[in-house]
Amino acid sequence: MTPKYPEKITFAHLPTPLEEMQRLGKHLGGPRLFIKRDDQTGLAFGGNKTRKLEFLVAEAREQSAETLISGGAMQSNHCRQTAAAAARFGFECTLVLTGELPDKPSANLLLDELFGAKIVAVPDRKDRDRILQEIFDTAVAEGKKPYLVPYGGSSPTGALGYAFAMEELMRQKPYEGSEPSQGCPDWIIFGTSSGGTHAG
């Protein structure tokens, strides 16, 4: 029996390239090193959150949500991509960001604003969860239909993006000419924060 996965909206530029870092491998004495270029997923300058958002935005649509609410650091890549997805698919967007708003927005914060996101600055990180929930509850009380995008897009739904990324990686067969059993990497190393990539 084939498992049934939740729907997703396809907007990432996939598959992302798998590039060998030959000079670095040579410098380190011979291991073959590859980098999976998920900086090239395409949404708002790319990044790994796009894979998660394909599933999360589909879930928000399925629930007839009107606004996406999420949070993170003041220069969060996740929030930048959430704001971009909201703009692309017609959602309102509220972002609860930790830190003080600068006089002049730049980098991701500037992009958040260009994508039309409403920014709520929270000076102390320990207050962020409470304020995020208050914004969500207020939207519900006003008769709106909010969808809470978890930090980093990390939830069982969002993690599916990286379950499928592993399938994609295995199909790319980086070790040309090797036996199928030898075609998998010995190690996979990545930066992590909210755990969704690990879970996938």
Write out the residue ranges for each language-model feature:
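PLP-dependent amino-acid enzyme catalytic core
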Residues: 1-200
